[in-house]
C-alpha cells in the first residue's frame, strides 16, 4: 500500500465520521470488511513509510559525504526531495486530522 492510498482511505473515513456526526442519519458507504483496515494501522503504516524514506535519504547522504563512489549527487538530492515531499504530506494529513478532531469536539450534542 502506498502512502497516497492510505491517506485517501483515512480521509474517507474521517469524512464519513464527520458526515455522520453532522446529522446524517445514514453512514456513508464503506468498503467491505475484508479490505477495510483499522484507522490506527493505516496511520502507523503511513508514518512508517515516511520514516523509511527519510532514513534511506539520510543513509544515502551520509554515504555521499563519506566519499562512496557508488553514490552520486543527483541520487542523493532526489532521495532528499522525496523524503521532504513525503514528510510535508504527512504534516498536511496531521493538520487535517487535528482540524477534523476540533470540529467534532466543537459540535453541539
UniProtKB/Swiss-Prot annotation:
Gene Ontology biological process terms from the UniProt entry: bacterial-type flagellum-dependent cell motility
InterPro entries: FliE (IPR001624)
Record's subcellular location: Bacterial flagellum basal body
Keywords: Bacterial flagellum
Gene Ontology molecular-function annotations: cytoskeletal motor activity; structural molecule activity
GO cellular component terms, semicolon-separated: bacterial-type flagellum basal body
UniProt similarity note: Belongs to the FliE family.
PANTHER family on file: FLAGELLAR HOOK-BASAL BODY COMPLEX PROTEIN FLIE, PTHR34653
The name this protein goes by in its record: Flagellar hook-basal body complex protein FliE
Source species of the chain: Nitrosomonas eutropha (strain DSM 101675 / C91 / Nm57)
Upper taxonomic lineage: Bacteria, Pseudomonadati, Pseudomonadota, Betaproteobacteria, Nitrosomonadales
Amino acid at each position: 500500500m502506498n502512502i497516497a492510498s492510505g491517506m485517501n482511505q483515512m480521509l474517507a473515513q474521517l469524512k464519513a465520521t464527520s458526515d455522520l456526526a453532522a446529522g446524517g442519519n445514514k453512514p456513508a458507504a464503506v468498503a467491505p470488511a475484508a479490505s477495510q483496515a483499522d484507522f490506527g494501522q493505516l496511520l502507523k503504516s503511513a508514518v512508517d513509510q515516511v520514516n523509511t524514506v527519510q532514513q534511506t535519504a539520510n543513509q544515502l547522504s551520509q554515504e555521499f559525504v563519506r566519499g562512496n563512489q557508488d553514490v552520486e549527487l543527483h541520487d542523493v538530492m532526489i532521495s532528499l526531495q522525496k523524503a521532504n515531499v513525503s514528510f510535508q504530506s504527512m504534516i498536511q494529513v496531521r493538520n487535517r486530522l487535528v482540524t477534523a478532531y476540533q470540529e467534532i469536539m466543537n459540535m453541539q450534542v
